[in-house]
Amino acid sequence: MKLAVIPGDGIGVEVTAEALKVLRKLVPDLQTTEYDLGARRYNATGELLPDADLAAIREHDAILLGAIGDPSVTPGVLERGLLLNMRFALDHHVNLRPSQLYPGSKSPLAAQPDIDFVVVREGTEGPYTGNGGAIRVGTPHEIATEVSINTWFGAERVVRYAFALAQTRRKHVTLIHKTNVLSNAGAIWTRAVETVSAEYPDVETAYCHIDAATIYMVTDPSRFDVIVTDNLFGDIITDLAGAVTGGIGLAASGNIDASGTNPSMFEPVHGSAPDIAGQGIADPTAAILSAALLLRHLGRDGDAARIEAAVEADLASRGDSKVVTSEVGDRIAAAL
């Protein structure tokens, strides 16, 4: 297995090391190439995602990312120039966010049974395409626009991914949108679900407005199995999903090219946390679960399940003990 590794900034370096420690226990032939991308390189050279690095990354089976971001860089520079640029260049049109409440996780919904759902978020369209602008800036007549781009091609392929995933789970797909207001984009998403659902007669479907979905995610999260949604609503709902399942410190994600043309990228949802970087107290669990997600994407379901079981056991046994980054990685690797 050829793996491109982007440790990135802050605690990204530390948690990625633990994820690799776990991966190497299960993948003896793992070949890794590390890419220095993020704040350090940008501050040193002004480079964000050089063409040569992007071309080299394309040659790998998958990408493991730590975290990107540092106070020394203006907000938005790394996000747009590196993360979004890579997402578009590698056609990572599916953002996959599993949300499961593990025993021992600290959650406001710890008493809720059976919180286990997946959000399938469209990753390359919506209002994040940079289609917009502003005129008369700084005047009382300033006007700003952010155009949301939605295509049949983009929606249908993400919906199709969601239905295929639901087929392997509890066979239920919920579309989240705001079709009563965003009628044009909503029509595309609704038709995509109706069209694809005809090919999956045993998969049930449901619809929620985004505002109602936030209520249900807190009051009745077990109603969800696979959620499919657009880029903006997915961005919002996945952070809420992280909160109800123990916090984004436990949340893994995948940025996936479902066609397999480009390597998909897997990363913890949390940021670079520069305030605790270098102290060895960052929880690497989300990075380790991202490694499990990576293995499942590459067809190694058994290995992924072993990591997830080891994580579940580790979380259940921690109690109130303080997290030591390397010790978490050691325990989970030893359990394999």
Curated annotation (Swiss-Prot):
InterPro entries: ICDH/IPMDH (IPR050501), IsoCit/isopropylmalate_DH_CS (IPR019818), IsoPropMal-DH-like_dom (IPR024084), LeuB_actb (IPR023698). Mg(2+) binds at D211, D235, D239. It is an enzyme of class 1 (oxidoreductase). One of its GO terms (molecular function) is NAD binding. Keywords: Amino-acid biosynthesis, Branched-chain amino acid biosynthesis, Cytoplasm, Leucine biosynthesis, Magnesium, Manganese, Metal-binding, NAD, Oxidoreductase. Pathway: Amino-acid biosynthesis; L-leucine biosynthesis; L-leucine from 3-methyl-2-oxobutanoate: step 3/4. Catalyzes the oxidation of 3-carboxy-2-hydroxy-4-methylpentanoate (3-isopropylmalate) to 3-carboxy-4-methyl-2-oxopentanoate. The product decarboxylates to 4-methyl-2 oxopentanoate. The record marks Y128, K178 as: Important for catalysis. Binds 1 Mg(2+) or Mn(2+) ion per subunit. The gene is leuB. It catalyses: (2R,3S)-3-isopropylmalate + NAD(+) = 4-methyl-2-oxopentanoate + CO2 + NADH. GO terms for biological process: L-leucine biosynthetic process. It is found in: Cytoplasm. NAD(+) binds at G271, S272, A273, P274, D275, I276, A277, G278, Q279, G280, I281, A282, D283. Gene3D superfamilies: Isopropylmalate Dehydrogenase (3.40.718.10). Pfam families: Iso_dh (PF00180). It comes from the Bacteria. GO terms for cellular component: cytoplasm. Substrate binds at R87, R97, R121, D211. PROSITE patterns: IDH_IMDH (PS00470). This is 3-isopropylmalate dehydrogenase. Its EC number is 1.1.1.85. Homodimer.
